[in-house]
Regions:
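Sec-dependent signal peptide recognition
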Residues: 1-2
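Sequence context surrounding c-type heme c attachment/ligation sites in exported
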Residues: 5-183
Length: 183
């Protein structure tokens, strides 16, 4: 009984993140993912996926790249995501810090800096709305860093079933790596 009351109370404040997810939930660098709040299923369950389109194998320093996060999951009523770009070279003094800038190009995506100093791109309230029950995408721009080593992108996305509870939502994570151009 107490557990049910605690879960019911959590749904009104902790779990509902229509404006933005809490920073630091991409699943990368030891961070939790959306699964820490959206309970009931394993990460990457039931054949869905989240991918990042537009990440180059090799980036040119300072270049602007259009990127898109794509979530595919059946029966998605609402959805959200969080992405970060961080230095990945363990020998690099910048390891784990933000690499470049993720910039909004529309009202569906914005960014927030966490207490750890890392920048996170994520959905807005407008970005929760799906036009298809099987997929949703969010577009933004990544400005490649001017210095440093390889960059790893971590993304987590939540396929919500629309019942205003944290239960039975589906969470997906993925990552992509990009290396500096040899030019």
């Amino acid at each position: 009984m107490v557990v049910a009351a605690a879960i019911a109370g959590a749904t009104t404040t902790d779990i509902s993140n229509p404006e933005k997810p809490p920073p630091g939930h991409t699943g990368g660098f030891g961070e939790p993912s959306c699964i820490s709040c959206h309970l009931g299923n394993d990460v990457n369950a039931f054949g869905g996926s989240v991918t990042i389109k537009g990440i180059p194998d090799r980036f040119i320093r300072g270049k602007h790249y259009p990127i898109t996060v794509v979530l595919k999951a059946e029966e998605t009523e609402v959805a959200g995501f969080q992405i970060t770009a961080r230095y990945n070279g363990s020998y690099d003094a910048l390891y784990g810090k933000s690499a470049g800038e993720i910039r909004s190009i529309n009202s569906r995506v914005t960014s927030t800096t966490g207490d750890n100093g890392v920048s996170y791109g994520h959905h807005t309230a407008q970005g929760l709305v799906t036009s298809s029950r099987d997929s949703i995408s969010w577009s933004m721009e990544w400005i490649a860093p001017l210095k440093g080593s390889s960059v790893i992108f971590h993304v987590a996305a939540n396929s919500g079933n629309g019942d205003n509870s944290p239960l039975s939502d589906l969470v997906y994570t993925s990552n992509e790596v990009s290396h500096p151009s040899l030019q």
